[in-house]
Amino acid sequence: MKFIIKLFPEITIKSQSVRLRFIKILTGNIRNVLKHYDETLAVVRHWDNIEVRAKDEKQRLAIRDALTRIPGIHHILEVEDVPFTDMHDIFEKALVQYRDQLEGKTFCVRVKRRGKHDFSSIDVERYVGGGLNQHIESARVKLTNPDVTVHLEVEDDRLLLIKGRYEGIGGFPIGTQEDVLSLISGGFDSGVSSYMLMRRGCRVHYCFFNLGGAAHEIGVRQVAHYLWNRFGSSHRVRFVAINFEPVVGEILEKIDDGQMGVILKRMMVRAASKVAERYGVQALVTGEALGQVSSQTLTNLRLIDNVSDTLILRPLISYDKEHIINLARQIGTEDFARTMPEYCGVISKSPTVKAVKSKIEAEEEKFDFSILDKVVEEANNVDIREIAQQTEQEVVEVETVNGFGPNDVILDIRSVDEQEDKPLKVEGIDVVSLPFYKLSTKFGDLDQNRTWLLWCERGVMSRLQALYLREQGFNNVKVYRP
């Protein structure tokens, strides 16, 4: 099988040296992602496109899906590459390929041509279109808004019969821009802002401030791992967790009520800036949107920025909440965000929307900054690829099984779309479907006299959810890994 990768248009308008660098990086990213599916596949870069050739037909759908999620790709063409002799030969090959698709449909033919030939692209369109129209009685030509568009590409003596076109996410290849550190909370905003910087070519590391509760950190780990695995797995990234409970306690004890929100954000920026400096990261990323909450007015954002020289990027600054939620739905983080545990450790009764710098600084003089230094020093830094392994260690008390007993039920916790695409059927045992994002509210409704074997395709989500359910007091859960 063969795929032709078309570059994001902004890459094609770069200077020759920059364009070559971007294409080289994108080629490497594609190899890094696809080697998990087929180690023998070939990735070949050209000036206008990148070719992917693979032998394992069983991995065709998985490879195609992975390509649509790699930043820097505008669209993917799944093609059959065959030699040809003349225009009539092109027509005959197109007839074999497209006859069934065109029965009873309107169609047009669109051709792209590279190389030296004694015919033009329009000549091929007319000849092939006329031939298809004559040989398929139920089909008819319609040049505007046809039911089917027959895409052909002619390159020297090769004909590319395009079986399908699939849109990519666009943007720049990860690694073409410098690294950033995303302040991730697991909500709608931080997930979308992280994705937007990945799409723009940045390797995104994650910094999580735990304001209280292991369940929250488990949830945020899920989001970060999901984003990395889906859009950024071509690169290694860090997940840094900082226990911010001591900082919150100090703020609640010593800071004036109205200034708490702004000061908490200033402390987070200070801490994140130290982490960024430690690892050579150039900028912080937040999901703040102008006017969304009291700390996100222009005055307050300016005061928050003032505590650090590190650049703070806010890709969602002009977005409304509906737009952000729609983006979260598109990239697959909506369900995570909707079920994320909330820990509002600092809630002001009357938060200021226009903080005064002198008042903020006066309040911060009461704060013991050695507490902030200590939590940053003790921050837990892991390679995001190790989250699954670390979860295995943390859920030692949750048994992993590859078989089942008479009282067991398999609980398929994949998303609804995944369940519909690949239904799970295991002979000799009942299988119940309950998406992971409903476990926190619906698991208690299940028969607690049964033992529930949590299952997902890769085992990461099932282990994380098993840990969460055990913390909630459910001891009748195991992880199923056949």
UniProtKB/Swiss-Prot annotation:
Family label: Belongs to the ThiI family.
PROSITE patterns: RHODANESE_3, THUMP
Entry annotation: catalytic residues: C456
Organism: Shigella sonnei (strain Ss046)
Domain THUMP: 61-165
InterPro entries linked to this entry: Rhodanese-like_dom (IPR001763), Rhodanese-like_dom_sf (IPR036873), Rossmann-like_a/b/a_fold (IPR014729), ThiI_AANH (IPR020536), ThiI_fer (IPR054173), ThiI_N (IPR049961), THII_Thiazole_biosynth_dom (IPR026340), THUMP_dom (IPR004114)
GO MF assignments: ATP binding; CCA tRNA nucleotidyltransferase activity; tRNA binding; tRNA-uracil-4 sulfurtransferase activity
Function: Catalyzes the ATP-dependent transfer of a sulfur to tRNA to produce 4-thiouridine in position 8 of tRNAs, which functions as a near-UV photosensor. Also catalyzes the transfer of sulfur to the sulfur carrier protein ThiS, forming ThiS-thiocarboxylate. This is a step in the synthesis of thiazole, in the thiamine biosynthesis pathway. The sulfur is donated as persulfide by IscS.
NCBIfam families per UniProt: ThiI_C_thiazole, tRNA uracil 4-sulfurtransferase ThiI
Annotated metabolic or biological route of this protein: Cofactor biosynthesis; thiamine diphosphate biosynthesis
GO biological process, one term: thiamine diphosphate biosynthetic process
Localization in the cell: Cytoplasm
Keyword annotations: ATP-binding, Cytoplasm, Disulfide bond, Nucleotide-binding, Redox-active center, RNA-binding, Thiamine biosynthesis, Transferase, tRNA-binding
Annotated ATP binding sites: L183, I184, K265, G287, Q296
Cellular component, GO annotation: cytosol
Disulfide bonds: C344-C456
Protein name as it appears in the record: tRNA sulfurtransferase
Source superkingdom: Bacteria
Catalytic function, reaction form: [ThiI sulfur-carrier protein]-S-sulfanyl-L-cysteine + a uridine in tRNA + 2 reduced [2Fe-2S]-[ferredoxin] + ATP + H(+) = [ThiI sulfur-carrier protein]-L-cysteine + a 4-thiouridine in tRNA + 2 oxidized [2Fe-2S]-[ferredoxin] + AMP + diphosphate; [ThiS sulfur-carrier protein]-C-terminal Gly-Gly-AMP + S-sulfanyl-L-cysteinyl-[cysteine desulfurase] + AH2 = [ThiS sulfur-carrier protein]-C-terminal-Gly-aminoethanethioate + L-cysteinyl-[cysteine desulfurase] + A + AMP + 2 H(+)
